[in-house]
Protein backbone atom coordinates (compact mmCIF):
# COMPACT_ATOMS: atom_id res chain seq x y z
CA UNK A 1 0.00 0.00 0.00
CA UNK A 2 1.22 3.46 -0.86
CA UNK A 3 0.30 4.74 2.59
CA UNK A 4 2.52 2.20 4.39
CA UNK A 5 5.61 1.79 2.24
CA UNK A 6 8.52 4.22 2.17
CA UNK A 7 7.57 6.83 -0.49
CA UNK A 8 11.05 7.06 -2.00
CA UNK A 9 11.70 3.31 -2.02
CA UNK A 10 8.29 2.78 -3.63
CA UNK A 11 9.34 4.98 -6.58
CA UNK A 12 12.94 3.83 -7.08
CA UNK A 13 13.62 3.27 -10.75
CA UNK A 14 10.40 5.04 -11.73
CA UNK A 15 10.53 8.66 -10.63
CA UNK A 16 13.24 8.46 -7.93
CA UNK A 17 16.94 7.64 -8.20
CA UNK A 18 19.17 5.71 -5.84
CA UNK A 19 21.24 7.81 -3.43
CA UNK A 20 24.26 5.57 -4.00
CA UNK A 21 25.39 4.73 -7.53
CA UNK A 22 28.09 2.05 -7.79
CA UNK A 23 28.67 -1.63 -8.47
CA UNK A 24 30.56 -4.14 -6.33
CA UNK A 25 30.88 -7.90 -6.38
CA UNK A 26 29.37 -10.04 -3.66
CA UNK A 27 32.59 -10.13 -1.62
CA UNK A 28 33.07 -6.35 -1.44
CA UNK A 29 29.42 -5.34 -1.34
CA UNK A 30 28.98 -5.39 2.49
CA UNK A 31 32.20 -3.43 3.01
CA UNK A 32 31.25 -0.82 0.40
CA UNK A 33 27.75 -0.46 1.81
CA UNK A 34 29.17 0.06 5.30
CA UNK A 35 31.48 2.76 3.91
CA UNK A 36 28.50 4.61 2.44
CA UNK A 37 26.79 4.56 5.83
CA UNK A 38 29.99 5.73 7.50
CA UNK A 39 30.35 8.62 5.04
CA UNK A 40 26.78 9.81 5.60
CA UNK A 41 27.13 9.63 9.38
CA UNK A 42 30.41 11.55 9.34
CA UNK A 43 29.05 14.34 7.15
CA UNK A 44 25.80 14.62 9.12
CA UNK A 45 27.67 14.76 12.43
CA UNK A 46 30.32 17.29 11.40
CA UNK A 47 27.98 19.52 9.37
CA UNK A 48 24.97 19.45 11.66
CA UNK A 49 24.49 23.23 11.33
CA UNK A 50 24.78 23.35 7.53
CA UNK A 51 21.24 22.23 6.72
CA UNK A 52 22.16 19.02 4.88
CA UNK A 53 19.27 17.89 2.69
CA UNK A 54 20.75 14.97 0.75
CA UNK A 55 24.04 13.15 0.17
CA UNK A 56 24.65 11.36 -3.14
CA UNK A 57 27.54 8.93 -3.53
CA UNK A 58 29.12 7.66 -6.75
CA UNK A 59 32.11 5.35 -6.99
CA UNK A 60 34.55 4.86 -9.87
CA UNK A 61 37.39 2.45 -9.15
CA UNK A 62 39.24 4.03 -6.18
CA UNK A 63 37.49 7.40 -6.53
CA UNK A 64 34.49 8.49 -4.47
CA UNK A 65 32.35 11.39 -5.72
CA UNK A 66 30.11 13.07 -3.15
CA UNK A 67 27.29 15.49 -3.95
CA UNK A 68 26.16 17.33 -0.82
CA UNK A 69 22.84 19.18 -1.12
CA UNK A 70 22.74 21.88 1.54
CA UNK A 71 20.78 25.00 2.41
CA UNK A 72 23.93 26.78 3.63
CA UNK A 73 26.75 26.08 1.16
CA UNK A 74 28.97 28.73 2.74
CA UNK A 75 29.19 26.68 5.94
CA UNK A 76 30.29 23.60 4.00
CA UNK A 77 32.76 25.35 1.68
CA UNK A 78 34.32 27.54 4.36
CA UNK A 79 36.65 30.46 3.80
CA UNK A 80 38.66 29.91 0.65
CA UNK A 81 37.48 26.31 0.37
CA UNK A 82 39.07 25.31 3.67
CA UNK A 83 35.86 23.63 4.83
CA UNK A 84 35.76 21.21 1.90
CA UNK A 85 39.45 20.39 2.27
CA UNK A 86 39.04 19.71 5.97
CA UNK A 87 36.01 17.53 5.28
CA UNK A 88 37.86 15.57 2.59
CA UNK A 89 40.88 14.93 4.84
CA UNK A 90 38.60 13.89 7.70
CA UNK A 91 36.76 11.41 5.48
CA UNK A 92 40.01 9.92 4.19
CA UNK A 93 41.27 9.47 7.74
CA UNK A 94 37.96 7.99 8.90
CA UNK A 95 37.68 5.53 6.01
CA UNK A 96 41.34 4.65 5.74
CA UNK A 97 43.13 3.74 2.54
CA UNK A 98 44.35 6.03 -0.23
CA UNK A 99 41.12 6.47 -2.17
CA UNK A 100 40.50 9.81 -3.82
CA UNK A 101 37.47 11.78 -2.60
CA UNK A 102 35.85 14.57 -4.59
CA UNK A 103 33.17 16.75 -3.01
CA UNK A 104 30.60 18.78 -4.91
CA UNK A 105 28.42 21.20 -2.93
CA UNK A 106 24.94 21.92 -4.34
CA UNK A 107 22.73 24.63 -2.90
CA UNK A 108 19.07 23.83 -2.20
CA UNK A 109 17.06 26.51 -3.99
CA UNK A 110 13.68 25.99 -2.29
CA UNK A 111 14.48 25.43 1.37
CA UNK A 112 10.86 25.58 2.56
CA UNK A 113 9.84 22.88 0.04
CA UNK A 114 12.48 20.33 1.09
CA UNK A 115 11.15 17.57 3.35
CA UNK A 116 14.44 16.95 5.15
CA UNK A 117 14.98 20.63 5.94
CA UNK A 118 11.37 20.98 7.12
CA UNK A 119 11.76 17.98 9.42
CA UNK A 120 15.07 19.36 10.72
CA UNK A 121 13.42 22.71 11.49
CA UNK A 122 10.56 21.00 13.36
CA UNK A 123 12.90 18.85 15.47
CA UNK A 124 15.02 21.85 16.42
CA UNK A 125 11.95 23.76 17.59
CA UNK A 126 10.58 20.76 19.50
CA UNK A 127 13.90 20.35 21.32
CA UNK A 128 13.55 23.98 22.39
CA UNK A 129 10.22 23.03 24.00
CA UNK A 130 8.07 24.98 21.52
CA UNK A 131 4.47 23.75 21.18
CA UNK A 132 4.24 21.16 18.40
CA UNK A 133 1.00 22.68 17.06
CA UNK A 134 2.67 26.04 16.62
CA UNK A 135 5.75 24.51 14.99
CA UNK A 136 3.70 22.42 12.54
CA UNK A 137 1.55 25.42 11.66
CA UNK A 138 4.61 27.55 10.93
CA UNK A 139 6.21 24.81 8.81
CA UNK A 140 3.05 24.39 6.73
CA UNK A 141 2.76 28.14 6.22
CA UNK A 142 6.34 28.32 4.96
CA UNK A 143 5.75 25.37 2.62
CA UNK A 144 2.61 27.00 1.24
CA UNK A 145 4.58 30.15 0.48
CA UNK A 146 6.98 27.95 -1.50
CA UNK A 147 3.99 26.89 -3.65
CA UNK A 148 4.11 23.15 -2.96
CA UNK A 149 1.14 21.09 -4.15
CA UNK A 150 0.59 19.49 -0.76
CA UNK A 151 2.27 18.69 2.54
CA UNK A 152 1.64 16.28 5.40
CA UNK A 153 3.39 16.42 8.79
CA UNK A 154 3.08 13.77 11.49
CA UNK A 155 4.45 14.02 15.04
CA UNK A 156 4.44 11.05 17.43
CA UNK A 157 5.38 10.65 21.08
CA UNK A 158 4.69 12.42 24.37
CA UNK A 159 3.48 15.62 22.77
CA UNK A 160 3.86 18.67 25.02
CA UNK A 161 4.90 16.34 27.85
CA UNK A 162 1.64 14.35 27.95
CA UNK A 163 1.61 11.19 30.05
CA UNK A 164 0.26 9.05 27.20
CA UNK A 165 2.04 9.06 23.85
CA UNK A 166 -0.06 9.75 20.79
CA UNK A 167 0.23 10.55 17.10
CA UNK A 168 -1.11 13.68 15.43
CA UNK A 169 -0.84 14.77 11.83
CA UNK A 170 -1.84 17.72 9.66
CA UNK A 171 -2.27 17.75 5.89
CA UNK A 172 -2.73 20.66 3.51
CA UNK A 173 -3.35 20.14 -0.20
CA UNK A 174 -2.94 16.82 -2.03
CA UNK A 175 -0.44 14.14 -1.01
CA UNK A 176 -1.13 11.15 -3.36
CA UNK A 177 1.11 8.47 -1.88
CA UNK A 178 -0.18 5.67 -4.13
CA UNK A 179 0.43 7.53 -7.41
CA UNK A 180 3.78 6.44 -8.80
CA UNK A 181 4.22 9.49 -11.02
CA UNK A 182 3.75 11.81 -8.05
CA UNK A 183 6.96 13.56 -6.97
CA UNK A 184 6.88 12.88 -3.22
CA UNK A 185 9.70 14.09 -0.99
CA UNK A 186 9.85 12.29 2.36
CA UNK A 187 11.93 12.69 5.51
CA UNK A 188 11.99 11.26 9.02
CA UNK A 189 13.75 12.81 12.01
CA UNK A 190 13.73 12.36 15.78
CA UNK A 191 13.70 15.08 18.42
CA UNK A 192 15.42 14.45 21.77
CA UNK A 193 13.24 16.16 24.39
CA UNK A 194 13.24 15.99 28.19
CA UNK A 195 10.05 13.89 28.00
CA UNK A 196 11.46 11.37 25.54
CA UNK A 197 11.92 10.96 21.80
CA UNK A 198 9.46 12.51 19.35
CA UNK A 199 9.25 11.16 15.81
CA UNK A 200 8.66 13.63 12.97
CA UNK A 201 7.63 12.55 9.47
CA UNK A 202 7.19 14.94 6.54
CA UNK A 203 5.68 14.26 3.12
CA UNK A 204 5.88 16.98 0.43
CA UNK A 205 4.04 16.69 -2.89
CA UNK A 206 5.82 18.78 -5.54
CA UNK A 207 3.79 17.79 -8.59
CA UNK A 208 3.59 14.93 -11.07
CA UNK A 209 6.42 13.64 -13.26
CA UNK A 210 5.22 12.49 -16.69
CA UNK A 211 7.49 9.82 -18.28
CA UNK A 212 9.28 11.18 -21.34
CA UNK A 213 8.92 14.79 -20.26
CA UNK A 214 11.50 16.87 -18.43
CA UNK A 215 10.58 18.07 -14.99
CA UNK A 216 9.86 21.80 -15.07
CA UNK A 217 11.11 23.55 -11.91
CA UNK A 218 8.41 25.52 -10.14
CA UNK A 219 9.13 29.27 -10.19
CA UNK A 220 9.53 31.18 -6.98
CA UNK A 221 6.21 32.90 -6.23
CA UNK A 222 6.27 36.64 -6.83
CA UNK A 223 2.60 37.61 -6.43
CA UNK A 224 2.36 39.25 -3.03
CA UNK A 225 -1.47 39.58 -2.80
CA UNK A 226 -2.00 35.88 -3.55
CA UNK A 227 0.57 34.84 -0.94
CA UNK A 228 -1.05 37.04 1.70
CA UNK A 229 -4.52 35.65 0.97
CA UNK A 230 -3.32 32.06 1.44
CA UNK A 231 -1.62 32.88 4.71
CA UNK A 232 -4.70 34.61 6.11
CA UNK A 233 -6.98 31.67 5.25
CA UNK A 234 -4.65 29.16 6.91
CA UNK A 235 -4.23 31.26 10.06
CA UNK A 236 -7.98 31.71 10.42
CA UNK A 237 -8.60 27.98 10.05
CA UNK A 238 -5.89 26.95 12.52
CA UNK A 239 -6.99 29.54 15.05
CA UNK A 240 -10.29 27.72 15.52
CA UNK A 241 -8.60 24.74 17.21
Curated annotation (Swiss-Prot):
Occurrences of domain KH type-2 (ranges): 39-109
Annotated segments matching region Disordered: 214-241
For bias kind Basic and acidic residues, which ranges apply? 232-241
Provide this UniProt record's keywords sorted from A to Z.
Ribonucleoprotein, Ribosomal protein, RNA-binding, rRNA-binding
Pfam families associated with the record: KH_2, Ribosomal_S3_C
**Which segments cross the bilayer?**
none
What InterPro entries does this protein's entry cite? KH_dom, KH_dom-like_a/b, KH_dom_type_2, KH_sf_prok-type, Ribosomal_S3_C_sf, Ribosomal_uS3_bac-typ, Ribosomal_uS3_C, Ribosomal_uS3_CS
Identify one Gene Ontology CC term for this UniProt entry.
Answer: cytosolic small ribosomal subunit
The biological processes this protein is annotated with in GO are: translation
Q: State the Gene Ontology terms under molecular function.
A: mRNA binding; rRNA binding; structural constituent of ribosome
Carries keyword Cytoplasm?
A: no
Q: Does the keyword Cell membrane apply?
A: no
Role summary: Binds the lower part of the 30S subunit head. Binds mRNA in the 70S ribosome, positioning it for translation.
Please give the subunit comment from the record: Part of the 30S ribosomal subunit. Forms a tight complex with proteins S10 and S14.
The UniProt entry's sequence similarity note says: Belongs to the universal ribosomal protein uS3 family.
- The molecule here is called Small ribosomal subunit protein uS3
Originating species: Rippkaea orientalis (strain PCC 8801 / RF-1) (Cyanothece sp. (strain PCC 8801))
Task: Cite the source lineage.
Answer: Bacteria, Bacillati, Cyanobacteriota, Cyanophyceae, Oscillatoriophycideae
Q: Which gene encodes it?
A: rpsC
